[in-house]
Amino acid sequence: MVKLSLQCAVVDQAGSSFDVEIDDSAKVSKLKKVIKEENPATITCDAKDLQLFLAKKDDAWLDGAGAAAVELDEHGHPQGCVQMDPTLWVKNPKHFGDNFQPGEGQVHVLVVVPEGVVGSASETSKMDFVVDKVSKLYEHSVLSKRTRYVHSEMSSSKGNKLVKELKIRVTPVDAVPFTGGSPTPVEEFEWIKGRTEEQQSGRYRDYVEANIGDVLRNNKLCVFSVEKGANILSVEVPGCDVDLAGRTDMIVLSAIVQKFPHYLPHLPGVKMLIEVKREVKSASEFQALSELIAMDFIVDESVMALLTNLTNHWEFLWVSNKSNNRPIIATTTLTTPGEAFEVIRTLLAQSSTADADIMLPCLAEPVKRRKLNQMLPFIGEASGDGIRESIERYYDIASCLGPDFDMARAVARQVTRSIPTLSYFS
């Protein structure tokens, strides 16, 4: 699920351009509601009465001037623009697709507000009003309690709060002398004074790649630098009112992303993430921890995280077993690059079909790697997601066929039962 930033403009209203954010997996009917909520004073009709069109002509997005110059045809539709289907997802290929990237100065959605829309005191409008009010009450009482954590803004206090919310315990594991003797020594990365971490990202990517090149080639993997703004580690944690957002510095995954970078959000064949800090602080571990949690929920593979300054701190983290009904994230720290790269090579040499438990040269016991989605509770069909889907389904049907009184009442009852303060009266 990716947040899209869409620039919208109301047709025939000069200076009406505005920006909205919406999940790419949301339906267009949801986009209508978001647009109305963004403009409560200027858009007074029901959200379902809005008509949305792609602000695109000749396969090119319109700019502000182009959107302002759009004319309506005899049907009240912007000439040459494709109407968006309220029953389809925003990311449907007929709309924005999976690889949509907004550009500066572009307008993406044209909004047509019907003329002569007047409120009515009829039974129909009353029922729509009730459903809309109850929907907003539910969102305010239940859905608005979600907490959002941005990886790069993680602090010790936020990290401790996140771990507490997810009921996760972090357990350090002490390293042992390497089996088979000391690994081949490797020089520490040399940081250039006066340059930021970001300015040296290309250099340290080459450093990592040079020390694990053989295993990368043998397993068709690569070390990929994640550009700023590519928030590929953004996810809603199932079963918890927690959202994680952001990215990491480097990811080791299938080499196909070098040929086709647009596959990066899918994280094909991902093995591990690498968070680089020139100076490792107490909050750095929580940043790597939140990135690991996000990636674990996004992909099917068992993955590892590495927090490192590329000199004397190489901390590996992974989702381990469960103890006292709490998921364990284990961590072990090495102090030399030679040891760390030997561990990385061992990890990457494991096939994608290998057992989740593996032997690493720095640990006495096999590393147990598990998935958080097997250890954390999920939201039931009758709770948050089910309620939200019921409300959206009602609006989808009503936008096409008109209000359904029985369905509206059923949705209202379902919502009120889910709110503790109202469940007594339902």
UniProtKB/Swiss-Prot annotation:
This is Crinkler effector protein 4. Residues 59-107 are annotated as: DWL domain. InterPro entries: Crinkler_N. Residues 20-57 are annotated as: LQLFLAK domain. Belongs to the Crinkler effector family. It is found in: Secreted; Host nucleus. Pfam families: Crinkler. Disulfide bonds: none annotated. Induction: Expression is up-regulated at the early stages of infection. The CRN proteins have modular architectures that include a signal peptide, a conserved N-terminus, and highly diverse C-terminal domains. The conserved CRN N-terminus harbors a distinct LXLFLAK motif, which is followed by the conserved DWL domain. A highly conserved HVLVXXP motif marks the end of the CRN N-terminal domains and forms a junction where diverse C-terminal domains are fused. The conserved CRN N-terminus mediates the translocation into the plant host cells. It comes from Phytophthora capsici. A motif (HVLVXXP motif) lies at residues 108-114. GO terms for cellular component: extracellular region; host cell nucleus. Disruption phenotype: Leads to the loss of abilities to suppress pathogen-associated molecular patterns (PAMPS)-triggered immunity (PTI) in host cells. Keywords: Host nucleus, Secreted, Virulence. Residues 115-426 are annotated as: Effector domain. Secreted effector that is critical to pathogenesis by suppressing plant immune responsess. Promotes Phytophthora infection by suppressing the H(2)O(2) accumulation and callose deposition. May induce cell death by regulating expression of cell death-related genes. The gene is CRN4. It comes from the Eukaryota. The keyword NADP does not apply.
